[in-house]
């Protein structure tokens, strides 16, 4: 089976680069420093307009932080899912937990029903759930198509033992997609160890600002941002290294 590469794309242009590099699919996100949040209508529509072959999955996450949502946040998620259906994207990506760290089955069912017929991926909320094997069976029963996971570790290489066990237990009933720390120099090891066929990675490079006048004394965001005059973007050449 051919290796399937999903790129975590932070913009419409990153989707263009991912397609040019040969990726199968993107997960389109805003708010990368927060772990990914729902992109805007304009970003999704532009990504669709500028690409023709790549599948676009859109993350549905109204904020950073935990995965315990208020009803107001759920309403926002439902509206964003409806928008994604109108824009005819390939799929949506979300995950919801209870206060006790279990999959919020009723809420996930509600969102999955709203998303039909789009593909549904459970994102790395899975990595902070209490019992991954119970969660696996619940997500299969709910009809999720895939789980994005680092094996409940800080990166997918460290999570190899759990991901391999998840692939084994899933037995083809759901796709287990390793992500977080997947690089061109370790994807072969992860593939061989886990038996996974779909992989999630960023494949980004820094894009430097073309601003000539620069006031570097006034940051626009968090102090962890290294410079106001650089961003990151999917790099088509890096994508090619995974194919």
Language-model regions, residue ranges each:
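Catalytic cores of alpha/beta
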Residues: 10-20, 68-81, 127-142, 166, ...
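Glycine-enriched alpha-helix->loop->beta-strand junction motifs that scaffold or abut catalytic
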Residues: 19-26, 51-53, 88-91, 114-118, ...
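C-terminal alpha-helical cap/extension of soluble enzyme domains
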Residues: 170-243
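Active-site-adjacent beta->alpha loops and helix N-cap segments on the catalytic face
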Residues: 12-16, 32-55, 72-75, 96-116, ...
């Amino acid at each position: 089976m051919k290796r399937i590469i999903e790129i975590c794309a932070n913009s419409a242009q990153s989707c263009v680069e991912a397609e040019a590099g040969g990726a199968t699919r993107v997960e389109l996100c805003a708010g990368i420093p927060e772990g990914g949040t729902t992109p805007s209508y304009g970003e999704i529509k532009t990504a669709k307009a500028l690409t023709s072959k790549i599948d676009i999955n859109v993350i549905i996450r109204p904020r950073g932080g935990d995965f315990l949502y208020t009803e107001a946040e759920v309403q926002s998620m439902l509206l964003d899912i409806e928008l994604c259906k109108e824009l005819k994207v390939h799929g949506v990506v979300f995950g919801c937990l209870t206060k006790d760290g279990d999959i919020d089955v009723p809420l996930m069912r509600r969102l999955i029903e709203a998303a039909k017929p789009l593909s549904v991926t459970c994102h790395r909320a899975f990595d902070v759930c209490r019992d991954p094997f119970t969660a696996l069976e619940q997500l299969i029963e709910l009809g999720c198509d895939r789980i994005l996971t680092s094996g409940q570790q800080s990166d997918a290489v460290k999570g190899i033992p759990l991901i391999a066990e998840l692939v084994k237990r899933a037995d083809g009933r759901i796709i287990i997609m390793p992500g977080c720390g997947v690089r061109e120099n370790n994807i072969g090891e992860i593939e061989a160890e886990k038996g996974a066929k779909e992989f999630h990675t960023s494949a980004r490079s820094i894009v430097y600002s073309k601003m000539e006048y620069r006031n570097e004394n006034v940051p626009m965001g968090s102090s962890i941002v290294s410079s106001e005059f650089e961003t990151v973007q999917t790099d088509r050449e890096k994508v090619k290294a995974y194919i």
